[in-house]
């Protein structure tokens, strides 16, 4: 495998974490329940933070393609998180 190639194991791992975030954001069907859930912003944020930590801890040890994959998914997930959070209807309880 060249220094610029994308490891199928690494990319599958990253994409499985991305799918988990998508489930927590309510964007895709929960495979266990068979339906879309209401957004769980706490769980989604935790998974995004885990991906960010993975990026930080693997810095300098990934191929160029792996680095690009991680940067791109984090960028997209963070934007999506903000979008979902903006549309989150909060109930104000006095």
Regions found by a protein language model. Give the residues of each.
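N-terminal intrinsically disordered, cationic/polar leader segments
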Residues: 1-49, 53, 64-94
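Acidic, glycine-enriched active-site microenvironments
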Residues: 58
């Amino acid at each position: 495998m060249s220094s610029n190639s994308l490891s199928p194991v690494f990319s599958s791992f990253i994409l499985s974490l991305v799918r988990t975030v998508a489930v927590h954001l309510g964007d895709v069907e929960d495979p266990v329940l068979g339906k879309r859930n209401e957004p769980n912003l706490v769980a989604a944020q935790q998974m995004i933070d885990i991906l960010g930590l993975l990026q930080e801890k693997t810095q300098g040890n990934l191929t160029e393609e792996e680095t690009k994959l991680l940067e791109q998914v984090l960028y997209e997930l963070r934007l999506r998180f903000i979008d979902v959070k903006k549309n989150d209807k909060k109930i104000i309880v006095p």
